[in-house]
Amino acid sequence: YEAFSHIIDSMFNQHAKWLDASKTEVSWRAPISSENILLSSTVWRQDHNGFSHQEPGFLDIVVNKSPEIVRIYLPPDANCLLSTIDHCLMSTDYVNVIVADKQRHLQYLDMDEAVKHCTKGIGIWDWASTDDSADEADVVMASCGDVPTKEALAAVAILREEFPSLKVRFVNVVDLTRLMPAEDHPHGLTDVEFNALFTADRPVVFNFHGYPWLIHKLTYRRTNQERIHVRGYKEKGNINTPLELTIKNQADRFNLVIDVIDRLPGLGAKGAHCREHMKNRIIENIRYAYEHGVDRDEIANWQWPY
């Protein structure tokens, strides 16, 4: 259970320190199998347990340990999870933390695509993007985690319908440490690599699985960091439907669309009207969840439409 992973905080800390010392300071010690920690029953799918089971902060503890030791993976779908698990089980002398929900989720990538994406750890999803080589993106929508990825994709689908000429780039992150500078972590990106993905000056709306300030912490030295706007879990929740919980934390598709509109004043009056429409959709879906205890079919059974 993700929420109860803090029970082993101290054990994780001691093992990570021991691994660091044995790997970097003791030449005669043989490699050992990595410690692989799978966090499931995640924060975003607590339809029955509620607030007490909503705690994604283990990642904040893990990321503080030696960059030679810790790895954090948040695969967006089942094939990416398989690729990640395969990699972690074959590794030695690491602590690999994998965050994956146990509920059913959409499948975005075939196995070959998943292996390539997970090997890179981060990448642009061309099929979900509307920018191309001729036009720079107007905005970057980024995601990290299974539920946040679904909501971010749903937001992009709405933007494509409402603003057909808007150039949106979609970036998905599997390996969280890829966001760190290359000089701080062996998996980190150089500034050139980071800007190639996120641009150097366009607004970024980032939907994250955990506490949003962790992304700000990892990216604070990047070019124009103030343009990176992060959504994530903000200690708002109860026994909620999946969409209702994301709405409470403003990590849902409708709030993400509003975030994009607020950062693109050029959308003008059309943006203002769409913003009001999104607010109405939020109210409608909260009322439905409260009355019926489930999300609308169009939400629960949503599929990528393009």
Language-model region placement:
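Active-site nucleophile and cofactor-binding loops and adjacent substrate-binding regions
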Residues: 1-7, 30, 39-41, 73-76
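Thiamine diphosphate
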Residues: 24-35, 39-60, 67, 84, ...
